[in-house]
């Protein structure tokens, strides 16, 4: 067993190809264990409040409906663009974080502020690079028919009906959301790691395990806090991604709701959801998201640090 290093710390200098590869590994690992939860979460976000049973039974309602009407394989709908999304996003996020970390270190920002700023830039970069895969995944997951949609067909439909902007529908909102998420996640992660490092020598021996537990939970804590704060923005973005779909009326019993979004921007759609469905609708799927966030962020950070450790041997 090796001592876990913090290769994301201010001043760390890791080769670009190593951060790119390690980020891809961490993204693929995270995706492999969370795909079914991701599918349920997106289905919940895309369904207006009046379309489901009370909050406590929403997850089971969606899961039972999918198994009954679409089969068990439906939990992996959109898995190819989803996997490409995670790999691309993970590679871009960690490699750009390392790059910005290197170039912003000379500015002498306080360590916690440095992590927050670098995390924001990494979030913007990874969002832009991976966003078309996110749009494809959302539309493929929205398919509630037994037969899966062709990825190439969906790409052609988006290009034909919406052009290049169709692949970036809601991208500005996404950059805002992901920038906040990355800033909060990396900022919290580094704050906890720095706190643990600073208190390691002064902590009593019988309380060392508490510090170690906190240290190893840094990524998970950061992910949970970020998800709670930004989840409403993600819900609005999902609806923007789906509202212009060619298959809207076929895949959704609530096409009239989406029709009311036509011509609206991010803020207007958010206000429309609040007015017609209430604030709880913006948090539809939050329990699944948090359940997914814990393993995702843990595996993501652990996978990245582990991959970097072994790549440093070469």
Curated annotation (Swiss-Prot):
Q: Which UniProt keywords apply?
A: Membrane, Mitochondrion, Mitochondrion inner membrane, Repeat, Transmembrane, Transmembrane helix, Transport
- Spans of repeat Solcar: 14-103, 110-195, 210-310
Q: What is its main location?
A: mitochondrion
Entry keyword annotation includes Membrane = yes
Q: Which GO terms describe its biological process?
A: mitochondrial thiamine pyrophosphate transmembrane transport; thiamine pyrophosphate transmembrane transport
Plastid is among the record's keywords: no
Show the InterPro entries listed in the entry: Mit_carrier, Mitochondrial_sb/sol_carrier, Mt_carrier_dom_sf
List residues traversing the bilayer. 14-30, 84-100, 116-136, 170-186, 217-233, 285-302
Q: GO CC annotation: what is one? A: mitochondrial inner membrane
Q: Which domain of life is it from?
A: Eukaryota
Q: Which GO terms describe its molecular function?
A: thiamine pyrophosphate transmembrane transporter activity; thiamine transmembrane transporter activity
What switches on expression, per the entry, is described as:
Expression is regulated by carbon source, with very low expression with succinate, acetate, ethanol or pyruvate as carbon source.
Task: Report the subcellular localization.
Answer: Mitochondrion inner membrane
**Residue ranges that the Swiss-Prot or TrEMBL entry lists as coiled coil:** none
Kindly give the membrane topology term recorded for this protein. Multi-pass membrane protein
Family that this chain belongs to: Belongs to the mitochondrial carrier (TC 2.A.29) family.
Chain's role: Mitochondrial transporter that mediates uptake of thiamine pyrophosphate (ThPP) into mitochondria.
Q: What is this protein called?
A: Mitochondrial thiamine pyrophosphate carrier 1
Q: Which organism is it from?
A: Saccharomyces cerevisiae (strain ATCC 204508 / S288c)
The gene name reads: TPC1
